[in-house]
């Protein structure tokens, strides 16, 4: 699972996702890509599941680039805890994804192999996505 080695602060505010992505919305490494169409938090487990699905499907051919990184900690309180007594401890990491963001890129394979591999990764994502070609 992906997570930062160290951060400046242990906990973050939730924030809000408005507008479209202005960074990371063009293909820059491979030839084929998976692009987000909705805003969401994507967990490090979901990113890893998508990456594994793509590598298994493509087998030894091609190269895969993961274009998002989970750098936001999500805190959780223990179950059946009374209100108050501070914010919970960080449990997992998420990547904040806005519409237009490239999630994965792929190169060195034919289009139908890339399409199949990327559709498997798309099924692991909690949002609607689209397959794009540079």
UniProtKB/Swiss-Prot annotation:
PROSITE patterns: RIBOSOMAL_L16_1, RIBOSOMAL_L16_2
Keyword rRNA-binding: no
Matching CDD domains: Ribosomal_L16_L10e
A GO CC annotation given for this chain: ribonucleoprotein complex
Region (Disordered): 1-22
Gene Ontology molecular functions: rRNA binding; structural constituent of ribosome
Keywords on record: Chloroplast, Plastid, Ribonucleoprotein, Ribosomal protein
Record SUPFAM superfamilies: Ribosomal protein L16p/L10e
Domain of life of the organism encoding this protein: Eukaryota
Main location: plastid
InterPro entries: Ribosomal_uL16, Ribosomal_uL16_bact-type, Ribosomal_uL16_CS, Ribosomal_uL16_dom, Ribosomal_uL16_sf
Subcellular location: Plastid, Chloroplast
Entry keyword annotation includes Chloroplast: yes
Alphabetical GO biological process terms: translation
NCBIfam families on file: rplP_bact
Family label: Belongs to the universal ribosomal protein uL16 family.
The protein's assembly and partners: Part of the 50S ribosomal subunit.
Name of the featured protein: Large ribosomal subunit protein uL16c
Organism name: Nicotiana tabacum (Common tobacco)
Taxonomy of the source species: Eukaryota, Viridiplantae, Streptophyta, Embryophyta, Tracheophyta
